[in-house]
Amino acid sequence: KDAGNYGDKTFLKSLPGEGWSGSLAEYDDGAARTAPVASYAANRLGIFDLGGNVWQWCEDEYKASMNAPDVLKEYPVLEKEKASDGTAFRVLRGASWLNNDPLTLRSSFRNYDYPGFRSGIRGFRCVLVVSGR
């Protein structure tokens, strides 16, 4: 339960008969969808929730070169950098409660979407600066 909120046993149980499977079938973070802030252990820098829960919108325009060659081979759709209307996609990072493929769980993995697209697997990671740290 220390890694974060990803597509796991609890998620799979919430979708009976859907035919979902995945490489995280033995992992169980206890949340079927989004989890409250700080539900999982902080990293070595004391930062919570950098992986899983929801994809984090970033200001950066997406570029295919941001991903490693093995990622682009597995997900050729990530070669696309703009929408059909010419709008540049924006970067999404951190994976979500829906993801269970080890490639998409890498901190280096970049996903993308149309700016302003909304869904239950995309959002923001809020930061609180603690004085004296």
What are the roles of these predicted feature ranges?
Residues 1-111, 120:
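Functional-site microenvironments in short loops/helix caps that host divalent-cation chemistry
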Residues 119-133:
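Short, structured beta-strand segments at or near domain termini in extracellular proteins/domains
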